[in-house]
A protein has these predicted regions:
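Short hydrophobic/aromatic-enriched beta-strand-loop microsegments
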Residues: 70-76, 148-150, 245-250
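Active-site phosphate-binding/coordination module
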Residues: 32-130
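Short, structured coil segments at secondary-structure junctions
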Residues: 66-69, 76-77, 181, 241-242, ...
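A short, Lys/Arg-enriched amphipathic alpha-helix followed by its capping loop at the start of a domain
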Residues: 10, 14-18, 34-47, 210, ...
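Asp-based phosphoryl-transfer active-site loop
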Residues: 12-29, 239
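Mg2+-dependent phosphoryl-transfer enzymes with acidic/Ser/Thr/Gly-rich catalytic loops
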Residues: 6-11, 32, 191-301
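Hydrophobic "anchor" residues on beta-strands that sit immediately upstream
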Residues: 15, 72, 227
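Conserved acidic, metal-coordinating active-site core of Asp-based
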Residues: 120-227
Length: 301
């Protein structure tokens, strides 16, 4: 995998932050083949892709190899930010070195989350099955992951996905129990998630501050615009953080009804195909804007 040396590249004008499952990756096959045209276009324009997911650190390794990904990434729904060492000319605040990364940890330890899930299960009188309770075979059946990928998904550090079967009132009570214990919850494509005081938006904002700081160190200083892509409620904090929020259709062709922002862009497609189309459309728009700005600058000079 290539390393990114900030001294050899100018700062990007745009950053794209994206959810994975159901967006860049197909929710059933986990393929990104339909998104390859947009991925190639982003690479040609030197636009960093920041991967933001509920996936574990262990799951990211093979995925980043497949994508030839060299930029920062955010794991377990904003629980930790991983920044390759050569990304910035400084060490991010509150980071520690871990292998070839600066790591900023924001999440609550997994063991504590498991204990709280058991407490809530007892309080509501209903079994709650977390990832830690599922066998590898059950994870494979629920998610469609291959065995090796399911094993990697089990290596959780900060976020406990769990399954709930019951009426809305039960779900409301479970969520209330979580909040009264000083923790948070969110909903992804398949699971609810028990987390600490972290989310995708908070992690993204910390990373964006680093990019903006680096941009101000350039001569002349560079401003950065941000694009964020998601498909479900756990992506809402991310979409609230960026300049251009994008919502991809769910597998059934609908949009998550809990996400409704005034400047929201709705992709006219689902999964990586919808992701591909909306990214290409945005790139065309930014190219046209850049051409207009260049024309104005020429006229002024």
């Amino acid at each position: 995998m290539r390393t990114y040396d900030i001294s050899n590249e100018t700062m990007p004008r745009y950053l794209l932050l994206t959810d994975l499952d159901g967006c860049l990756l197909d929710s059933e096959t986990y393929s990104f083949d339909d998104a390859r045209p947009a991925l190639n276009a982003l690479r040609a324009e030197h636009i960093p892709i920041i991967l933001v997911s509920g996936k574990t650190r262990a799951e990211f390794d093979p995925l980043r190899e497949r994508l030839d990904h060299r930029y920062p990434f955010i794991v377990e729904n904003g629980a930790a930010v991983y920044v390759p060492l050569d990304t910035f000319s400084f060490s991010p605040e509150r980071s520690r070195r871990r292998s070839s990364y600066h790591v900023i940890e924001l999440g609550t330890p997994y063991a504590l989350l498991r204990d709280v899930l058991r407490q809530i299960e007892e309080a509501v009188g209903t079994p709650l099955r977390g990832f830690g309770d599922l066998s590898i075979e059950e994870i494979m059946a629920t998610t469609g992951l291959l065995r090796e990928d399911a094993l990697r998904a089990k290596l959780r550090e900060f976020d406990e996905p769990f399954l709930v079967n019951g009426p809305p009132k039960l779900i409301e009570e479970i969520c209330r129990q979580i909040v009264t214990r000083g923790l948070n919850w969110t909903r992804g494509g398949r699971f609810f998630h028990l987390t600490g005081n972290n989310d995708k938006g908070r992690a993204a904002e910390i990373l964006l501050r680093c990019y903006r700081r680096q941009g101000q160190l350039q001569d002349p200083p560079e401003e950065i615009e941000t694009i964020g892509i998601g498909d479900s409620l756990n992506d809402l904090p991310l979409l609230l953080t960026v300049d251009h929020p994008v919502l991809v259709q769910r597998p059934d062709g609908s949009y998550d009804p809990d996400i409704n922002l005034p400047n929201l862009i709705r992709a006219s497609g689902r999964g990586p195909a919808g992701w591909n189309q909306v990214v290409l459309d945005l790139l065309r728009h930014t190219t046209q804007e850049a051409a207009r700005e260049q024309t104005v600058n020429i006229r002024v000079t």
